[in-house]
Regions:
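Enriched for short, Lys/Arg-rich terminal
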Residues: 2, 8-25, 42, 48-49, ...
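Short, functionally important structural connectors and interaction interfaces within domains
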Residues: 31-32, 40, 44, 52
């Protein structure tokens, strides 16, 4: 699956690259996992509801979540920092 980053998600990704190598390693691991298995696996995948229906989240840490949506054979990453 290919990756598409929303503007905010790309800014978040660059932030983690500069701020925390451990965090970026975890994020890269989640990217690989989502590309293989978008709805199962590590990070406790959870389908979101209400205004975020169609999006999924995975835990990066207790504070931060990966929020994404599968569109055909692409994954749109919406955000990496904080809760949705």
């Amino acid at each position: 699956m290919s990756l598409i980053f929303a503007d905010e998600a790309w800014e978040d990704y660059l932030y983690w690259q500069k701020q925390d190598k451990h965090m970026i390693e975890r994020i890269n691991k989640l990217i690989r996992e989502v590309q293989r298995e978008p709805f199962t696996g590590i990070g406790k995948p959870e389908a979101l509801k209400h205004s975020l229906s169609g999006f999924w989240s995975r835990r990066i840490t207790d504070e931060h979540r990966m929020v994404y949506r599968v569109e055909g054979d692409a994954v749109l990453i919406a955000q990496w920092r904080f809760h949705y």
